[in-house]
């Protein structure tokens, strides 16, 4: 989970929270530049996919209030050109490296920045159209992050209606994009989402027992409407990579992919979510994760396919 690759903060009162320690100010272009520079090392370890979100994730990791303003959309659903520029650099590099990107559209800490449901629909349409115009074929759409979190202000982003948005993106893309949504830690997708989705996204936050992770995958396959499709944990804040049984191995043992969520501490060292982020493999926890990825994938360190 590296959703802050295009992060910025348009709120003057909080922008200084993310200042780099060496310069004393926040720089969104530097953030993306360093993200892109780190991608080949991730790929060399066998990593095949990353996650981004057009409204990011919580830059504090976990907090009740989210006063910052990080959104690739204007209040009316228009697209912000500067965000698209940063996004294109990451998507282009991922394509060069043979990596997929799970791209989220909306996040519950920022969806209120869109003034009404019409703006949400406009934002979704414009983001989808932009992806189609660019011709990207390695991007999967997560229409929103954790649709069952009660903080969503727009009904169409909540569990009982989010399938409508999934179908809207599918129709607009003429079924050329793969689309789904994710649920909060420990939750299993609802039937309406299972029937509408091309792949299913689970979260392991709050699930400390690897056996529960395995059970979540099995339960998901029992939801009415399920047919063979990829199941992916794109967020889990449990590690234990030195243990023979951990959440990552439990998910993979059920033929589900697993996503590493390491929030960090806004110190340009720890984690991959709280800015300013050091996107390198620079801590013991990051090294432990990537070591396990390399072990499980059999990567030799020469897998990156880099085109001129």
Language model region names:
Residues 31-35, 103-105, 127, 213-220, ...:
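Generic hydrophobic, helix-prone segments enriched in Leu/Val/Ile
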Residues 6, 25, 75-78, 260, ...:
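Intrinsically disordered, low-complexity regions
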Residues 122-123, 138-140, 144-291:
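Extracellular glycoside hydrolase catalytic/binding regions
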Residues 1-199, 203:
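Active-site mouth of glycoside hydrolases
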Residues 11, 274-275, 307:
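Intrinsic-disorder/low-complexity coil detector
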Residues 285-308:
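Carbohydrate-binding surfaces of carbohydrate-active enzymes
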